Structures are given as C-alpha cells and as structure tokens.
C-alpha cells in the first residue's frame, strides 16, 4: 500500500486503514464533512448567543459571524448589524447538513459496499480507484477541482446578484460586471506589479475578477482530468504521488500553502476582512516563531477576530507542513523506524 514496508495501520491512523477499500474511504470523507458542518453550525450558534451589539464585532473574539457579515448577511449602512436571524438560520442549516452527512457516512460504513466497484449504482462505480490506476485517480482529482471551481463561481454569482460588504464605502453592494478587470488580475496582480499586490487588493471588482479567473482555471482543470488520464511523463515525474502516502503528502502541502496565504491575507487585508468585523490590521512580531499581534489596546487576554484567525491559520499551516514532510519522505521510501536502529548502531560503535 505505502512505499515503505509498513502496509498495516492501527486504528489511530485514520483514513490510512481504508486505503484499499474505496467504499470505506468514501465513508470516512463524508464523516469528515459531517464534523466540519457540525462545528460550523454549532460555533455559529455559540457566537450568536454571546454576540453583544454594543461592542465592536471585531473585539468579541468571533470568527464565523464576521465572515457572514462580510458576505452581506444582516448588515446595514456603516457595517451595523441590523438582523441576526440569518446567522441563526445558517447555523441551523449547517447542523441539519451535518446530520445528513453523518447518516451518509454511517450508510457507507455499515451498509454500503467496502469496494465501490461492487456497488449496485453505475455512477458510484466511477469513483472506485486503485493506486496503480492513474486514470481513476485523475478522474477523482478532476471532480475535486470541479467542486472548488463551482464554489469560486458561486461566490462570483453572489457578488453579482446579492453583493457583499464593501468596506471602502461602508455599504453592501453588488458587482455589476464581475469579470471586468480580469486582465488586471492576470497581468498586474499575477506579477505583483506596483500597487497590485494580491494581498492588498482594495476593490470588489478586482476581488470578483480574481475569483472568476480562478473558477475558470479550476473548472477547466477539472474537465481536463476527468477526460484525460495523466500523461506517462507526468506519472514518471510524480510517481510518489500515486500512493496513499504520496497523495496525503501532496494534500497536506496544498493545505499548508493555503494556510500560510490565508494567515498573511487575513492579517493585512481590509477589503475581504473589513475592520468593522475583524478589527484593524495586525503587526508581525518575531520570537521563537513569527506571530501577529493586535495594533489596538484591548483588555488583558483579549484579541481581535483578525488576530485569532491569522495566528491559528499560521500555526496550523506550520504543523500541517511538518505532516507533509513526514508523509512525503515515507512516500519516497524512507522508513522512520530505522532511525533508532541507526542511532543504536552508532552508540554501539562508540
């Protein structure tokens, strides 16, 4: 299963136990969706219960409601919260969704086939995979890219027809032509030209065009990988990825990169993270490790929503990166269990 000589995993090894059982693998992923939506729904309702309209939202240690406010839910002029009922509805919807996902996970764990190739549904058989079948792995990658592409496209549609909070004018507004500045996204933001650092994007038109561009790229990549198996040269170049350890290492690398990008973006950007909801931009400090601090005076032990989001993303990204390195080395054939033996032999020689 893995490129190391340790094909068996204990109960604590998570999805690795199901690397050869596509049905169980699917069940584990659906269960993760259930946990994520349960957390999102529960924390949204928890934050709503402790929300104080007399205190700035950014100074209350909230992390989910500020995102909903940025999307224009229940927000009036100047970033004032005029209706909290949408937050309640969204929290409940996520809890209901978590129950649906949980039921799906239980079905696939207890009733569904362990191997999707044995499913009674032809569509489900399309998602059975073998680690030496590059076409099947490419097909699954393609569907993941489609999901991300549709999400980016959905945000563009939301910008066009509902609108989000624009911190530059203090109002919720729509973007009437969300692809108008796509050339700027490609040739200015894409090359970090002066006044076009993507981390400091300062208008909704560019934000919309960036998401429209990413949506097109992701959807094109999704359709490509669904219909085109990886080329032989790609399989040779990325041979270590066609294994459970390799796939996990690549996923963790992407997650880590996204975490570092999100940490810095949330620390400095005031368009996607308005000051009204997240607090003012942060200041970078250095100690044993880099960290970001608030630039306003708060009661002892209190932090802005921006500080929580930024620092949690940064340190999670750091530890996820260590996981990437661990699994990447295992995918390349390195056996960590030999390290104590090697150290023991050195001490014996001494």
Curated annotation (Swiss-Prot):
Gene Ontology MF annotations: chlorophyll binding
Subcellular localization(s) per the UniProt record: Cellular thylakoid membrane
Topology class, membrane: Multi-pass membrane protein
Transmembrane segments: 26-46, 62-82, 87-107, 214-234, 248-268, 309-329
Named cofactor requirement(s): chlorophyll a; chlorophyll b
Keywords, sorted A to Z: Chlorophyll, Chromophore, Membrane, Photosynthesis, Photosystem I, Photosystem II, Thylakoid, Transmembrane, Transmembrane helix
Gene Ontology BP terms: photosynthetic electron transport chain
Cofactor note: Chlorophyll a. Chlorophyll b.
Keyword Thylakoid in record: yes
One cellular-component annotation, GO: plasma membrane-derived thylakoid membrane
InterPro entries: PS_antenna-like, PS_II_antenna-like_sf
Pfam families reported for this sequence: PSII (PF00421)
Signal peptide bounds: none
Function summary: The antenna complex functions as a light receptor, it captures and delivers excitation energy to photosystems II and I. The Prochlorales pcb genes are not related to higher plant LHCs.
Family: Belongs to the PsbB/PsbC family. IsiA/Pcb subfamily.
Quaternary structure note: The antenna complex consists of chlorophylls (a and b) and chlorophyll a/b binding proteins.
Protein name, UniProt field: Chlorophyll a/b light-harvesting protein PcbA
């Amino acid at each position: 299963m893995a490129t190391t000589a340790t094909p068996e995993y204990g109960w604590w090894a998570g999805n690795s136990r199901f690397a050869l059982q596509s049905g169980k693998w699917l069940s584990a992923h659906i269960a993760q969706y259930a946990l994520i939506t349960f957390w999102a729904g529960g924390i949204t309702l928890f934050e709503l219960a402790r929300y104080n309209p007399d205190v700035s939202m950014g100074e209350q240690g909230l992390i989910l409601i500020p995102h909903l406010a940025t999307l224009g839910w229940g927000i009036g002029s100047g970033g004032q919260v005029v209706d909290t009922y949408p937050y309640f509805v969204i929290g409940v919807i996520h809890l209901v969704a978590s129950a649906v996902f949980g039921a799906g996970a239980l079905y696939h764990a207890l009733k569904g086939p362990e191997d999707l190739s044995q499913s009674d549904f032809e569509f489900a058989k399309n998602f059975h995979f073998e680690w030496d079948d590059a076409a099947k792995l490419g097909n699954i990658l393609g569907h993941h890219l489609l999901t991300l592409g549709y999400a980016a496209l959905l945000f563009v549609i939301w910008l066009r027809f509902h609108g989000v909070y624009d911190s530059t004018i203090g109002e919720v507004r729509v973007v009437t032509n969300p692809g108008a500045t796509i050339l700027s996204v490609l040739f200015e933001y894409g090359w970090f030209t002066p006044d076009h650092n993507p981390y400091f994007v300062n208008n909704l038109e560019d934000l919309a065009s960036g998401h429209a561009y990413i949506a097109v790229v992701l959807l094109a990549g999704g359709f490509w990988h669904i219909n085109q198996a990886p080329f032989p040269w790609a399989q040779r170049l990325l041979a270590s990825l066609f294994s459970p350890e390799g796939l996990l290492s690549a996923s963790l690398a992407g997650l880590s990169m996204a975490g570092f990008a999100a940490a810095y973006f949330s620390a400095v950007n005031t368009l996607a993270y308005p000051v009204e909801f997240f607090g003012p931009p942060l200041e970078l400090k250095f100690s044993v490790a880099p960290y970001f601090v608030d630039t306003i005076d708060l009661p002892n032990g209190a932090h802005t929503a921006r500080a929580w989001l930024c620092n949690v993303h940064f340190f999670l990204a750091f530890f996820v990166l260590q996981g990437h390195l661990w699994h990447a080395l295992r995918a390349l054939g390195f056996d960590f269990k030999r390290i104590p033996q090697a150290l023991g032999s050195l001490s014996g020689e001494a």
